[in-house]
Amino acid sequence: MFSRNFYYRVKYQINKKAIFDVFYQYFANRLKHPFNKNQKKKLKRLHQKYLETKRTSTDYFSINAYYWDLIINKNFKEFSYLEIGSWEGNSASYILKNFKTKKVFCVDVWDTNNDSPKEEERSRFKNFIFNLKEFKERFSFFKGTSDEFFKNNDQKFDVIYVDGWHEANQVYKDIDNSWNCLNVNGIIICDDYFYGDIKNNLVNNLPANAINKFLFENKNKLKVICVNNTQIFFKKITN
């Protein structure tokens, strides 16, 4: 009934000390897959087609378009959005193109130093600006670390996407800081929950370690609402 990768992911969750709700939502998501897989493919293809007009070196987002569409539309008619780790603006472009937003704020370090040894690193910010230029009046960005952004931030948000530096301590800081500026009933989306060597899961300095730690510490203040093969979504139900 389930693939080998499903069992590897369950083992991964056990190893990373996931709370029960994470197991439950992942299992529920896999049970629904036969019934929604066509819609997943449709939304994935639609966004990939849209990206043909953009400049992207990678696309890790399109596979999750279905979940963003489903969960955001179910919870919000209009919302404010923050993302930590914008890369070339793939996820931000999806938000701006498909939803009614109050504000969209993007945070990334974007290595724009002309002395950078890697041309691709210097081009990411240029790609980000190019990819979002059609929405230039609807978004803002902060060029710097997430720690620097949160230190001076006084804004609140309804949806926050955490996809910054993947070392566990930094992921935890990003989630904790995001939580503090998240409105009640707001949603945090964490990328790369299943990350690294899923089969052997020997490393304990990954996003899942930080995510599970935060979920355990705040389990009475939040609700896990979705776990797919790459991302986890949870809602703030109280301060």
What do these predicted ranges mean?
Residues 7-11, 16, 36, 77, ...:
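Intrinsic structural disorder/low-complexity segments
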Residues 12-18, 59, 63, 167:
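Intrinsic-disorder/low-complexity, polar/charged segments
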Residues 24-77:
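Class I SAM-dependent methyltransferase Rossmann-like catalytic core
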Residues 4, 9, 30, 42-45, ...:
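Arginine residue identity/basic-tract feature
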Residues 1-33:
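Boundary detector for helix-to-coil junctions that initiate low-complexity/charged tails
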Residues 6, 57-59, 239:
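N-terminal compositionally biased, intrinsically disordered segments and leader/signal-like regions
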Residues 50, 54-55, 65, 69-239:
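S-adenosylmethionine/decaboxylated-SAM
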